Amino acid sequence: MTTTHNPPEGAQRLPLDKLHAWEALGYGMFIHFGMSTFVGQELPSGSEPSSLYAPTALDVDQWIRVACDAGMKYAVLTTKHVSGHCLWPSDHTDYHVGTSGNQTDVVEAFVTACAKHGLMPGFYYCSWDNHHRFGSVTWSEAPLERTFTTARYRDFQMAQIEELLTRYGPVGEVWVDIPGPLGHEGRREQYAQIASLQPEAVIMMNHGCTDGSSLRYEYAWPTDLMAIERFMPASNRGYKPWHTVAQTRTDVQDYYLPGEVCDPIGYEWFWVEGDTLRSDRELLGMRLIAQERGTNLLLDVPPDQRGVIPEATVQALRRLHRNMEQFGS
């Protein structure tokens, strides 16, 4: 049986050959690093002083060397997470590395290292911000379905993303986390801005913890990718990238949305003292399942409070690479 699509190439913004090129990357490093690393929790209050962020031996180049040695082809950096603290000196706030205990522009160092080692750079940006509230209601105060952002916050986010996408050169992926509170029009405006500033980049609106079997239109549309967070693709027959999207009763079209699994190498997104690494067997299973079911794997590898990836993590990645060479393809 032949499956047909309307139009045959799909209604998505990017052509199929561009999306297939992204799929061919296969394996990337998610880098969760920032204020949360120093607070010891993923979701800080946003009231922490900027000076608390103070890596003592920051080595961004080491992160990308480790990724390259592990066989990864791209990397995505958390430029701003829930804390609201920015890894670049933003003109739109004073809550950033320029006022912190280590003034290195981490975003600049990241794209420089990616260029040096031949990895595709990507930027993560979180729409939930506990520091820059501007009247928004966050997940800290209400169930996720009742959160919202104000127009002032959305303007702030777009101004910051414009900085990121015009200051540091080309990026291959823009990863917007917790996009639901932006609202449908807010997401459409954000998507359009990113597509205008970086037309070659794939745009991820994170769906949250799902297995990729269905599109959460009301939370994460529009998007170029399907997020599969802390899950593996549901079907052992493989991830199904074609999704039928009904934007209105009369606007029903097929979109090709490649899948990206994201999960940490341990059990926490950020470095937390005492967090344990997954076993070699589990990590190999994650790699093989993602590959066999037709999705990319964005494996989170968090640097510690020094600003380096710990040696135990480096060795785990090397063993995984060797195991993939033996058992994978």
Label every PLM stretch briefly.
Residues M1-S329:
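Mature catalytic domains of secreted/periplasmic carbohydrate-active enzymes
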